[in-house]
Every structure is written in structure tokens, then in C-alpha cells.
């Protein structure tokens, strides 16, 4: 209901079934992944002679044209075609959970920066927020590229996501910022390629409470000459209560929004950290 109901207000969904696409009707025999000498095959669970490996891979490659329009992909947990990770792979009678669905593998190889998640994992508040945030960032980037990318626009984009990146991995975020600054004389297309790949790789890392506290305190510093001692104490206590898990992330963020509305700051007004996705999704309420 969250996917189709809540997210449906912001996303347009397209369903796709690889099994149906290769001609397997419904009802149909279940499939499984089997390790053979020449690699992993997708075969019938009861009929080993039903081997759809080549058809599945070929069909997955044929979906490239519409997949390149996507901003995210929700896959099916444990599916031999659509499982993102830990899919059962049989070698004899003993399965190991170390596989990836054939369709999912081709998708992720062709679009390594595309936000991908399994529907079952979206029940985890941290993974859900992470995936949806990446989808919005991916769409923002696509719009930026469509408008025509310039060095100035790329620098501005990075400035907007600086604190978001720091909440995921401070060291890699700083390294990315330094590398981007050093690349100011390079062709923007070349810079954009490695920059976006690293941006999405950093965002894929789970943001931590420790990193969030660091970012919140950094933002607090912008207000040191703007708010009185009572407000400073309240803000510091709120951040600390988040640190020790007495409050969700939305509380210190809401308080920071309040202060920056009263005391606007040009740089903070542009940052996506305080508004990474629509408030109606309530994704920060459970972090």
C-alpha cells in the first residue's frame, strides 16, 4: 500500500514481468537458479529440461530503451529473475543464498547508477528513505542534464547535496568535493560521468546517526550569530536527544527549518538536506 498508495502520488509506475515477456503464461512452473559448469542457469523447478537462461538474458537486454527513462526500480525479493541479492542458487540439492536474478543482473549491469531496491526491504524505514531519496536525486540529475550541463550548474548541484552526502559518508563526500574542485578545467561531460557515479555510490551507503549529528551540528554553526542563548540551548539539546535516540530525525530538522526561515542563509536555502523529499512521505519521522 505504501508503494502504490503513498508513492503513487509522486511516481508513475510501470510493471514488467520477465517470465511473461519470454512467453511463460500463468499459471506457470516455478523457476530456480542452478549452478552448472558453464555458469548459472534459470530452469524449471520440476522440469530441468526447461532452461530459459538465454531467453531471459536476451529479453532483459531488449528492455534497454524504456529502462533508460526510469528513475528507480523496485525488484522482487528471492525471484530467480528479479531478485536483487541473496537469491537461492542450487548446486545439487543444497542452495546457497548468493545469487542475483538474471533480469535484475542485466538491469543493474546496464544501469549501475540507477536506484534499485527490493519491495520486501522497503519495509525497513532506513532502506525506504535511502531508496526514495536516491530516486529524487536521480530525477534531479536527469533534469539537470536535459537542460544542458555546465561546470557552474554541476558545482551548484554539488553544493545542494553536500550535507546529504556527508550524512552518508563524510570522508568520501569530502574527497568528492575536492576532486570536483580540482576538475574545474576538465570537459564537463567527462567530469559529470565520474561525479554522478560516485555521488550515487555514496548515497547507496546507509546514512548513520553519527553522521546526521555531525551535519546537524554543522548547520547549527550557521546560526551562532543569529539566535539567542536560549534558542541555542534548545537546538543543542534537541540534536543531542536525537543522538541518544530519544527523538526522530524530523524533530531537529524541523527546528532548524524554523530558525532558517527566521534567519535566511543563502547557502542553507539551497541545501537539500533539510528537504530531501516531500514532507507528506514522512520518511524522516521514523529515522
Enumerate the language-model features and the residues they cover.
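Short catalytic helix/loop segments, enriched in acidic residues and glycine
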Residues: 1-14
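Conserved beta-strand segments of alpha/beta enzyme cores
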Residues: 12-15, 115-117
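Short, surface-exposed acidic-centric catalytic microdomains
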Residues: 15-40
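Short, basic, glycine/proline-bearing loop/turn elements
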Residues: 41-52, 88-90
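Glycine-rich anion/phosphate-binding loops
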Residues: 48-68
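Short, amphipathic alpha-helical segments
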Residues: 50-57, 94-101, 105, 170
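Internal, conserved structured core segments that host functional sites
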Residues: 65-146
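Acidic, Ser/Pro/Thr-rich low-complexity regulatory regions
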Residues: 116-287
Amino acid at each position: 500500500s505504501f508503494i502504490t498508495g503513498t508513492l503513487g502520488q509522486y511516481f508513475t509506475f510501470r510493471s514488467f514481468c520477465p517470465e511473461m515477456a519470454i512467453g511463460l503464461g500463468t499459471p506457470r512452473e516455478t523457476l530456480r537458479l542452478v549452478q552448472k559448469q558453464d555458469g548459472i542457469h534459470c530452469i524449471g523447478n520440476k522440469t530441468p529440461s526447461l532452461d530459459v537462461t538465454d531467453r531471459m538474458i536476451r529479453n532483459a537486454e531488449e528492455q534497454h530503451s524504456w529502462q533508460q527513462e526510469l528513475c528507480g526500480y523496485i525488484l522482487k525479493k528471492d525471484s530467480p529473475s528479479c531478485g536483487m541479492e541473496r537469491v537461492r542458487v542450487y548446486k545439487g540439492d543444497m542452495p546457497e543464498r548468493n545469487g542475483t536474478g538474471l533480469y535484475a543482473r542485466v538491469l543493474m549491469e546496464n544501469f549501475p547508477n540507477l536506484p534499485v531496491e527490493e519491495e520486501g526491504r522497503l519495509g525497513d524505514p532506513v532502506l525506504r528513505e535511502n531508496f526514495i531519496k536516491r530516486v529524487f536525486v536521480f530525477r534531479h540529475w536527469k533534469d539537470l542534464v536535459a537542460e544542458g550541463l555546465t561546470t557552474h550548474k554541476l558545482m551548484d548541484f554539488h553544493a545542494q547535496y553536500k550535507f546529504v552526502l556527508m550524512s552518508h559518508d563524510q570522508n568520501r563526500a569530502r574527497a568528492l568535493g575536492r576532486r570536483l574542485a580540482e576538475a574545474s578545467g576538465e570537459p564537463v561531460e567527462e567530469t559529470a560521468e565520474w561525479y554522478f557515479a560516485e555521488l550515487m555510490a555514496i548515497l547507496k551507503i546507509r546514512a548513520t546517526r553519527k553522521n546526521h549529528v555531525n551535519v546537524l551540528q554543522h548547520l547549527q554553526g550557521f546560526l551562532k550569530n543569529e539566535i539567542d542563548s536560549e534558542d541555542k540551548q534548545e537546538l543543542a539539546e534537541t540534536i543531542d536527544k536525537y543522538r541518544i535516540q530519544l527523538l526522530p530525525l524530523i524533530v531537529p530538522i524541523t527546528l532548524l527549518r524554523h530558525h532558517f526561515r527566521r534567519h535566511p542563509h543563502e547557502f542553507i536555502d539551497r541545501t537539500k538536506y533539510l528537504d530531501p523529499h516531500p514532507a507528506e512521505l514522512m520518511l524522516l519521522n521514523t529515522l
